Amino acid sequence: AHPDDLEFTCGATVAKLALDGWAIDIVITTSGNKGTKDAKVTGQQLAGEREQESRAAALILKANEPKFLGFPDGMLHADDELRELLVREIRRLRPELVITWDGFRPGFNHRDHRVTGISAYDAIYPAADDHLFHPDQKHEGLEPHRPSAMLLAGTDDPDYHIDIEPFMDIKISALLAHASQMGGRDA
């Protein structure tokens, strides 16, 4: 959802996968334009800073250049527009594995996290794999694709575990790249 969510939730897992030879692609649904209490910064300035921070963190994690969908913070909707954009990215990137938020988690959970998780879930099945969803994408060379697996971050009911201890230093370094969120501003 937000520019620093990957690093907070699964940064060490992503570092492990990258070091194991996986190609890592990151899709960030929101701009991060409201993630501050600093009254001196505009949302546009903050969004630009957070994009740069995400690029720096991606380099640390050995990930490819992040894709920014640019929706404003707190304004994300689980609608056809977002699902179509996520289908496009799934078809373009053709991932074996997708890690996203648990959009079904009860209790406290940021709206953008819930919406991103539910929309990713809906994009993966059935939309990305069905040629009748968004057929115009085929004319762009984007063929249907269904990832082999999806992991949910921020879930209350984990059923899959990865030993991340050896990769925590990389995760922390990637987190620190998000200076606007790690004390570099009145976050």
Predicted regions and their residues:
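Active-site rim/loop-helix segments in enzyme catalytic domains that contact anionic ligands
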Residues: 1-94
